[in-house]
Amino acid sequence: MNIKDKDKLKEIFQIFKEDDIIEIGEKIIGIGGFGSVTEVKTKNGKYFAGKLIKSKKTDEIEFISEFKNKNIVQTIKIYNKSFKGENYSLILMEKAILKDLTTLNQNLFKGLLKIIIDTPFEGIVGDNLIRFYARQIIDGLESIDRNDICHFDIKTDNLLIFIRMKIKLSDFSLLKQLKNKEKGNKTNEVEIPGGTPGYLSPEYYQEKKRKRKVPFNVAKKQDYFAFGSTLFYLKYREEMLPYNEYDDDLMTSDYIIDLLQRAVDLIQSKEILSDKDFKTFLCSLINYDPNERPNFEEIYRNKWVNKNVQEINKIYAINSQNEEKLIMELNKSDFLITKKNELKKSDNKFIFDYNKSK
């Protein structure tokens, strides 16, 4: 739903006031191409996220209403209403208390997370913390992979953070069910519906002004590629594939492959101080050839992914007292509203420079 007028959005949101919804927030939390989100309060005093979409977007509604997984944002209830001849759905979902991984990653160096983490930070994000995130993302990916679904928009903005640093996948507006339910047969090809520049794989750009149809097994590799881009950003606080929004003609398959090769060269260079197993795993995920990327079983069993599991779970367990302290700190800080472009490059200990690898 591509409505950018916040006043119109607020007007549409208000028609969903029901007996069990007593308050719909004035502040629009997020506006996307397929939906907008605000805060909703129910009569029992609980707060949820309310996502407004046009009702014809049935794939997302069907999926989220049926699917249950600890690393997928859960749907509480779906309301349907008409407004000026258009049908809308309000999806009531659990609300992320710490927003998303983009916001969290931007603030790792501001000291706020010392409240919840028992070990000190050193500049770039440590492998244990990245692994802690990665294992939860993998658990979410496994559940949608097993059900023959592609998310097609995995990125840090769509990875929400809940109590005890639990990561949950959100925003299934681009999902594709890779199975014909009526015939019971898997499709041979699926069209990549789009996604977010910087997280889109080279196969998306293979044809110009195109319908980007790829084989079913390749489609799943798009989610794994985006997972690799996510790990890259979490680790190095840099976009892996800088996007030229003013010249879409530059975004060709060859251009993306060239950027990827430079990224791989830099990751593998000695000046990048990362765990060798992490480098190998990351480079496999962002391979420009989808057939060379690991399948899910290989991801799940990867050596780096399975390092220090018990230690990680112990280190990042948060008790109730610390959770309350964390929330208090967040409420009186700019943690939840920090914009990406406000960060200074000097905040990073390491900056990727693609020119070095030319």
Protein language model annotation of sequence segments:
Residues 162-199, 207:
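Activation segment/activation loop of eukaryotic-type protein kinase catalytic domains
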Residues 86-100:
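Conserved short submotifs of the Hanks-type protein kinase catalytic core
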Residues 207-225, 229-268:
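Conserved C-lobe activation region of Hanks-type protein kinase-like domains
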Residues 145-162:
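Catalytic-loop of the protein kinase fold
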